[in-house]
Amino acid sequence: MIPKIIHYCWFGRNPLPKSALRCIESWRKYFPDYEIKEWNEDNFDVEMMPFTQEAYKMRKFAFVSDVARFWILYHHGGLYFDTDVEVIRPMHDIVARGAFMGIEVECGNGLEYPYVAPGLGLGATPGMQFYRRILDHYSTQHFLDENGNQIPGTVVSHNTEVLREFGLQPHNDIQTVADITIYPIDYFNPLDDATGVLRKTQNTRSIHWYDKTWLDNYGPFRKWTTRIIHRYFGINSIAWIKHLFTK
């Protein structure tokens, strides 16, 4: 059984933004009997491995959270949400079925396997084999290369890579991998990040608002500008514009 606790991470010692507080309030609404626990520098060892140590030193706190969520759920179990996830419907049926994750990007159109994102929400019991494996995976990784530059890669790519080791199948329907139920995109990710279009269904339980706290101060402006361009001119339009002006 998944313990009745919701974990979230907030590193950097800045106050939580109003958007995060609204999301946390939605957790309280739909999980009234759950403890909600914040993890930060005071109760999580940011120097536990080179990846987290280097990310924290560079003030890339979202990448510290990428590892922390797996460590937390491996040792404690429970639910994990990023602070930009709003719960909009009851999830008790999903929690009752056991450990879960959700698809962020569907396979197809050249993508062989779906991308499964831990930022959409996680449910786990303590000591799950998958969580031990992904922690072992991260323990071999660095955040910075030998020149001090950030190494490309996201928690979604790392998560999906390890799920494939455990047998993730190339389809977008519900499947179970390593005792984890993987849910289709409409359950936890109805918002198209590229266009900002929201497509809720009767299955939708939560919305990931893509606050992108790891971006610089121009991040919100870039996010909304990019979505407008993608929505009206297509998702390949920005690449086309860049190509046009670099000929």
Question: Positions of the model-derived regions?
Answer:
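Glycosyltransferase-associated regions of secretory-pathway enzymes
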Residues: M1-S65, T83-K247
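Small-residue hinge/turn detector
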Residues: D66-G78
